[in-house]
Amino acid sequence: MAQSTEQQSVSRASVGLRSERGPILGSVMLSVGLIAIDATILATAVPSIVNDLGGFAQFPWLFSIYLLAQAVSVPIFAKFTDLIGRKPIMLIGIGLFVLGSILCGIAWSMPALIAFRALQGLGAGAVQPTAMTIIGDIYSVAERARVQGYVASVWAISAVVGPTLGGIFVDYLNWRWIFFVNVPLGAFAAWSLYRRFSEKVVRRQHRIDVEGAVLLGVGASLIILGLLEGGILWAWDSVPSIAILSVGALLMIAFGFVERRENVVFLGP
């Protein structure tokens, strides 16, 4: 019994942030925290952004495009982690996210900000699955539950802290600093991961389901476009509204049929 307790204590000590693998876990948590906070941090900054850039009718896209780009790119990058390794994809994801943050910070119009938010979302789509894969690689099955608790706490804290941080930046600095603050933090996470994390890549043969990715991306985009702009740019019962929503729904149905037919599924492991 005493030996079992001692083993549990050693196991707990080996998965903490102060352990040998702690810097890698810290980098993963920081990366995940950045993409999680950016999903909510704009909530309290919207009035200031609209006041500077205009485009009040388009501001919902700041949230939708980020989540859409992330959702579409997650399965793609998850496949690439098996092709070229976790470390390159994680660094690419952080790089895309940081580049998108810089461009968001210097955005000159609402359409430009929306486009750059999509770039952020692509980076987030690489970070999210790769972070969990790295954890699975460096921790045993017995250790993963505790480590996943660390990562889950990041998501929970980010949901609460995000809007608060957005309000602080708007009140005391400028809404652009919501994005600029990601640059040094993302750079530090990438540097730490580059130095501390090493892997032996075992290349596996995977076919990237481009057809599924296109159908999902275009179909979901059209549905979101129809829902966001319906009643604003066109009436709900107008031809554009019905056509956009119908085409989007048909593409999503086609996506479902394609995935049933494929041997290598876009949303599969």
Sequence positions of predicted segments:
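Hydrophobic transmembrane-helix bundles of small-molecule transporters
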Residues: D171-P269
